[in-house]
Amino acid sequence: PSYFDPETKMRGITLDIAKWKRPSPESAPVHAKAAGLYMICTLSKHEAEKKGFQDALMLDYRGYVAEATGANVFFIDGEGTLHTPIPDCFLNGITRRTVIKLAESLQMKVVERHIMPEDMADMNADMNCVELYCEVQ
């Protein structure tokens, strides 16, 4: 099953920027699948949907891009380099690591870095990835 219908996939999903932030590693077990952390994402997704968006982009406690509410985020720049946030306040899960390995196996340069929301304007494509769902927009 797909998270989004075919029309939405072709058009691309819209993301609101969540008002809630991913917490710092000193305040929650950010590298675990912890129920309290899911609440932040669930509330953010519901808020985004009320505003007409399909999902929300989660920023971390410093204002850097972290992830979508249920998916990792990746960006491709004009040179074909894959950029993804450093997983220092969210789970560095299997799907994320697999996407990175696949990109590297295709000889793509992968850069893990802190990404500010305004940096996204310089990217040619973005990708949201969660188990069984990974689409380039």
Please annotate each region the language model reported.
Residues 1-137:
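Helix-start/capping segments and mature chain N-termini
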